Amino acid sequence: MSARISLNVGREKSLLRKHPWIFSKAVNKIKGNPMLGDTVDVFDSKGNWLAKGAYSPESQIRIRVWSFDEHEEIDRDFFFAKLQSAQARRDWFISQGKLTGYRLIAGESDGLPGVTIDKYDNFIVCQLLSAGADFHRYTIVNCLTELYPGCHIYERSDVDVRKKEGLEPVTGWLTEPQDSTECIIEEHGIKIHVDIATGHKTGFYLDQRDSRLAAGKFAKDKTVLNCFSYTSTFALHCAANNAKEVINVDVSQDALDMGERNLALNGLSDANVSFVKEDVFKLLRRYREEKRTFDMIILDPPKFVESKAQLTGACRGYKDINMIAMQLLNPGGLLLTFSCSGLMEASLFQKVVADAALDAKRKAYFVERLQQAADHPISSNYPEGYYLKGLVCQVE
């Protein structure tokens, strides 16, 4: 019999809206002795059953809900059905975009809290970020081996958030070890090298797929500065769409080297594509002093804000970098700017960019909005799943 969790008065409201998180301060009583990752039943203060979820005694998110169906068992059939339905929801755009790399499970948004699963050609990468996800690791792997026979499964549970769950980092093969962790994926006709062991996140930024396509659409005959370029995949779309020049900037030489490999992989000329190992903030200031200008600038920085306490400082950082970028744009030039922080709401991000335009003494028109690709869905009961915001600004 599972442990029983009773909530404080009034703390059931979010669960009635099917939100999957229960915070520690909502918990009143615990009947039983649940261990890390155990499935528990949750009741309101009057004893009405609400949900069943995974217990995490060290996390502020004390319980992550698996199901709002009292009769549903959290077993192999449960995980198999979740994986099947997630794949079915993605089939249409996988076929449309001719994708061989995509996110299969986006955690809470796909009904599996703390579970991230990405498919890269014949590799599957699991990132298990919660106590419940960690507890059911081998059940999930067993389901994946049946659904995707012949695929090789690798774990990248090396994210700091696991510490908040009382979990150690875990990486390595979950199926038979392979000689290489590299593969090639394809999106919208562009081929990309991915290393699932050493690449960022689970190997690559799948969430920016639609934004890369948009960048290519705008790039024809333009001089493009691609900042925080990582493996230069924005540049691939720009070069493939006849950009006049593309400069990729990143602090990682390994990432830039992979960018050069990606360029060659797609048979694109390196005559008008260059790679600069430099701190973006310093380089932008130097270009401003040198009075360099561009027709299009892409700003895709790492996350500036991890907590609410950092939000004010993050806004200053976003404003500063967007201001300098606007000062480097030719009249009528385009700025593609992004924030990947869930705490940075879309309205606040737009205000920060508008403030940057004022400080730059430029006028900006927001001509298009961008967000995470469709394999990173935003479910109606989990608005926190909306984290990646992008703006296309025409700057005069």
UniProtKB/Swiss-Prot annotation:
UniProt EC number: 2.1.1.191
Places the protein is found: Cytoplasm
Chief site of localization: cytoplasm
Pfam families, per the entry: Methyltrans_SAM, PUA_3
First-level EC class: transferase
Tagged with keyword Nucleotide-binding: no
Keywords of this entry: Cytoplasm, Methyltransferase, RNA-binding, rRNA processing, S-adenosyl-L-methionine, Transferase
Gene Ontology terms: cellular component: cytoplasm
Catalytic activity: cytidine(1962) in 23S rRNA + S-adenosyl-L-methionine = 5-methylcytidine(1962) in 23S rRNA + S-adenosyl-L-homocysteine + H(+)
GO molecular function, one term: RNA binding
Span of domain PUA: 2-79
Function: Specifically methylates the cytosine at position 1962 (m5C1962) of 23S rRNA.
Family: Belongs to the methyltransferase superfamily. RlmI family.
Record's protein name: Ribosomal RNA large subunit methyltransferase I
The organism of origin for this protein: Colwellia psychrerythraea (strain 34H / ATCC BAA-681) (Vibrio psychroerythus)
Origin organism lineage: Bacteria, Pseudomonadati, Pseudomonadota, Gammaproteobacteria, Alteromonadales
Gene label: rlmI
